[in-house]
Structures are given as C-alpha cells and as structure tokens.
C-alpha cells in the first residue's frame, strides 16, 4: 500500500507542478477598483548630503516594493567605488523569476568621488505594487552644493507585516513542502534500511515502552534538526551578503550546473558524500556516546546530521543553495528544521510500532531516490529558463516531462503488481502530457496575443491611428519590466471571448520599455501613473478616462469591460 501511495504521489506531484502555476494567476484576479498611489506617494524619496557621503532613503507604502537591481547613480564616475546595496527580501514572480526587493523602508549610502566636479547627481529607481501595477523608471536629482535641501532620512515606525523575507503565507507552504521532502528522503535506500539499527542505538539498554521510545526518538530528531538548522543559519547569513550576485547570469548557470550534478548523484552516476576520513572520525565519536540517555542520544542525532548519506547529500546541498539565494536567516533555519523533522517521522513511527507501520525495504526505495533526482533536475530548468528564449525552454520542459515519466515508469515496473503498474504509468503519462501541453500552450498564447496589435512608437503615431479609425481604439501601454503586462498578454488578451470582443476595436500598442524621450512623452501626455495601463478612444477620437484600465484585469472582467464600451 505504501509503495502504491508513494509512486502515485510522485506522479500527481508532477501534474500539480505544471498545472498550479497556470491556474493560480487566473483564479486570483486583481480587482480593477484598486486606487493606486502616485509614484511619489508609493515611494517617498529623501536624501542627505554630508561632505562626500550621500544617503538616500525611501518610505515605501504598504503593498508596494522597490527593485534592488533598479538602483543606480548617474553619472557613474561620481562614485568613489561601487556602492554596496542594502539587504532586501526575496521576491518571485512567474515571468522574471527571483529578484531582491525592498518594502516599508530602505536606506542607501554611497561615497562620492573626490575628483567629481559636478553640481548634481541623479538617483534612478523603479518599483511596483502587489496589486499588479509597475511604475516607469524614476529619477531624482540631488544637489551636491553643501547640504541637500531635503530633510535627513529617518526610519519610520516598523510596519512590516511579515517577519520573514518570503512572506508568512509563502513560508508556511515552503515549510510544509520541505517537511514532506524530509519524509520522502527517509524512504531512500541509503536511509530507510538503517532505521532498525538506529532505533536500537537510540534506545540502548532502556526499557522498550512507548514513552521511552517516543521521548528518546524525539531527542535524536532534535539533535539532527538543530544541526541542519545551524547549517541553514550559516548559509543564509553568507547568502545575505551576496544576494544581488545570485541574479547574475553566470551565477545562475553555475547554480544550474550544480543542481544538475546533484540530480546525477541521485540517479546513481556517482556518490556524493563527505570524505571517508571525516565520516570515520565523526562515526568514531558517535560510537563513544551511549544510547538510552538524553545527552548521548542528542549527540548521536547531531552527528548523524553531519554524516549525510549519499542519498541525502544532494538534496541537502540543493536545499542549502535555495536558502543561500533567499538570504533569509530566519526562514533558512526554519526550512532545514522542517526538513529534518520530516526525516525523523519514520524513525519515531518505527520505534513506536516496531516497524509494523512502515513498509518493508525493497526496490521501491530506488524509485523514491530517482524521483528526487528529477525534482533537482527541474530546478536546473527553472534556473536556466530565465536566460534562454521561451521557444527553447518550452521544448526543454517537454523533453523533461516525457523523459521523467518514462524513467519513473520503467523504474516502478519491477517492484509493483500489474494493477499498480498500469495506474502509475497512466498517471505519469498524464503528467508528461499535461506538462508538455501547458508549455506549448503558454508559448503559443504569448505569440498569438502579441500579434494582435499595431505598434506605435510616439504620440504622433497614436494620434494618427486614432484619427484614421472609425471604430473604438484601444491603446495598450506595455513594457518588458512590467509583470502584469505579460500577464495581460498571456492570460487576458489570449482568451477567445476577449479576442471576439477585439473585433469591435482597433488595437494599438506602445512599448515604453526603454523609457526614452518618446516613451516619457507618451506617459506624460496621457497622464499615465504606471503600467499596465489601457486607454480607450471613441470613434470621434476622444480619450474616455472612465474606461481606462490601470493594473491587471482577468479575462472575464476584461471581456465585460469591453462589452460595456461597445454597448454605449
């Protein structure tokens, strides 16, 4: 029964992993009645000049954030050295991957070059709202003659709604995921067969009753958990200093290669573990501890966390890289603590039941190990897809899902009965088909929606298109740095019912990614707060502000919005 459950869970996990991202965006639409702040209200800028030191700060409104990689000082020769960016928190979205952002309040200091003779410098920054609006790149000039006219930057009251960088809700999901992964690691062939021996070592000569077993097993797990948690703390604290570098293409490639190597280890291509000499010394010290007492059992658990088996070394290394990239010390400790608790659950169950609640060791454990290998390989693809065209990443994912399904199906064909074989293979085939379809459909929708619009590049082009049309004109303002703009293209404009309504409109689009003089003129002329923004012009050529769309709108709501305009 356990074997069937594990293999079916593996297949369903593959299906969920590819269906959930597409569903979540469409099932959680942002309402259009959001009242967005102006850029200066969302990001209250302040500066102070003290001799050669300049300090700039932003008070960031709740549910808004600034991008770390958008911070820049112009001209660059005004700086004495490359300024160190303040620590931020990790932010992930479907289109741009992992970024470092600032919420609530951020302060940035840098030193001026003594040889710089200019009177002013310019600070550039850019941010977005959680509700789906991104502001154009913003510039603020700072006078360097004596002291800045602005007031000194002071920290506001602490309004942080989350203790953890990845957010409380996301942290809970992450902890549950790593707890489940810990349970999965416990069923790998290097770990699971050791539980009978380990249970005997933990109990020592103590009387074997459920109270002693539960208590000592818990102490052992705590020793292992604290060791892992300390590893997470060390790695996260180191990652905090280098968060910005984790977004560099070279670093992403290196990380992708590392995860691929970890995956090969789980496939049995080579053995990844501590040097034998280190293991011998740790095991020798562990052997000197006596089971059956709290201190001895705790030390044995702590040492077992260091002597990682070949089956756990690769996933543990992958978890450490994940924590290093987040740079969040608190969540780093919590994640590895959850992972180790998951690994300890089977030990506690084994001790309490004498092994009756757990399956017998067998070939099915290799399936679990291989499943972890495919999960690590998926991380490799997630990392490199940020650096390659969508068309290429689409085919890589298709190849991945098919190969993973075939590989797992072949692996489970031996240890399972014929009924379970058929069920599991069907589930794996469904996972591969679903994943492949989603990737192909995603690429096709992006191309399809993007080709609907006539491209305009300045105010004159817009005015000409509006003047020549005898229908309603819809002007879509787009930029590559706008996450919600991409959501519009992929999930809203690609909808068949929306496209049916498009027949009543002339569609034009202005790409303001570069934020050059022409782009700024467009945004200024039409008083655009941020992106995405969609303007509507009636057949007489007048812009109708009451129909303007600011921020993301899902397909159903946008279709109704178009119907309302046409029915006028």
UniProtKB/Swiss-Prot annotation:
EC assignment: 1.8.1.8
UniProt signal peptide: 1-22
NCBIfam families assigned to the protein according to its UniProt record, in alphabetical order: PRK00293.1
Annotated Pfam families: DsbD_N, DsbD_TM, Thioredoxin_7
UniProt domain Thioredoxin: residue ranges: 416-567
GO molecular function terms attached to this record: electron transfer activity; protein-disulfide reductase [NAD(P)H] activity
Membrane topology reported for the UniProt record: Multi-pass membrane protein
Catalysis performed (reactions): [protein]-dithiol + NAD(+) = [protein]-disulfide + NADH + H(+); [protein]-dithiol + NADP(+) = [protein]-disulfide + NADPH + H(+)
Keyword set, alphabetical order: Cell inner membrane, Cell membrane, Cytochrome c-type biogenesis, Disulfide bond, Electron transport, Membrane, NAD, Oxidoreductase, Redox-active center, Signal, Transmembrane, Transmembrane helix, Transport
Family membership noted in the UniProt record: Belongs to the thioredoxin family. DsbD subfamily.
Disulfide bond residue pairs: 128-134, 190-311, 482-485
GO CC terms in record: plasma membrane
PANTHER family, A to Z: THIOL:DISULFIDE INTERCHANGE PROTEIN DSBD (PTHR32234:SF0)
Bilayer-spanning residue ranges: 172-192, 215-235, 250-270, 294-314, 332-352, 364-384, 392-412, 418-438
Main location: membrane
BP GO terms, sorted: cell redox homeostasis; cytochrome complex assembly
HAMAP family, sorted: DbsD
PROSITE patterns, A to Z: THIOREDOXIN_1, THIOREDOXIN_2
Job of this protein: Required to facilitate the formation of correct disulfide bonds in some periplasmic proteins and for the assembly of the periplasmic c-type cytochromes. Acts by transferring electrons from cytoplasmic thioredoxin to the periplasm. This transfer involves a cascade of disulfide bond formation and reduction steps.
Subcellular location: Cell inner membrane
Protein name, per record: Thiol:disulfide interchange protein DsbD
